[in-house]
């Protein structure tokens, strides 16, 4: 998933690229570093027990650990290899695009319909996140968050 931003990539990354900036643009109550140091390999954030596993000047990648997923919201679930990468990619000297890549295995879900629903939910959640990042990176203010369960298109709570 990606979105164009009318700001240089370095400025975009400075505004939305810290590991716990996720709380603002994904609209979750809080994010704290629970282990390690913010921005360093191995840092763990309170959001889904996610671990920083790779980074460049304008990107980072993270994973959810099997132990978190084993005790995750809604009870134990099979490990799905979930990884995410957020990148600010330069397009011109004054514009960029934010690219969010998710990698996961949802083959353990009951059937094709359940797998397609899972993918659609993730796309909706992270498309909304990208739209929020664009607003913030371009100097705007996010509109009020929809109420939880706010209907179609409402951002789902973090994993």
Q: What does each of the following model-derived ranges do?
A:
Residues 1-3, 48-54, 64, 81-90, ...:
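Hydrophobic/aromatic beta-strand elements that line small-molecule binding cavities or substrate pockets
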Residues 1-37:
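Hydrophobic ligand-binding cavity/cleft-lining segments
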Residues 14-27, 57, 90, 131-142:
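Sec-exported extracytoplasmic/periplasmic mature domains
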Residues 58-67:
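Short, solvent-exposed secondary-structure boundary/capping segments
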Residues 70-128, 135:
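Beta-strand/loop substructures that line and gate deep hydrophobic ligand-binding cavities in soluble
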